[in-house]
Amino acid sequence: MIHVLKTWSEYFEEVFMGHKTFEIRKNDRDFTVGDILILKEWNIYTKSYTGRSLARNVTYLFNGGSFGVEEGFVVMSIQ
């Protein structure tokens, strides 16, 4: 499945540079390994999209409820 996600500029840039290889999100979309995330850069000051986007594959899921991750959230490894 493909998920289009709003991503703040500071985090978008870290994914773009390859430094950030995970996403933490509310799991209200039933994310699964193999999903594609389309990360669209969002400027929080202008409250608008910048026009930049990235596609990343979900390679691993950690469901919340333990190890400090809140129930209902998911940590996704992305490539």
Cite the ranges covered by each PLM segment:
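Catalytic phosphate/metal-binding cores of nucleic-acid and nucleotide-processing enzymes, i.e., regions
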Residues: 1-79
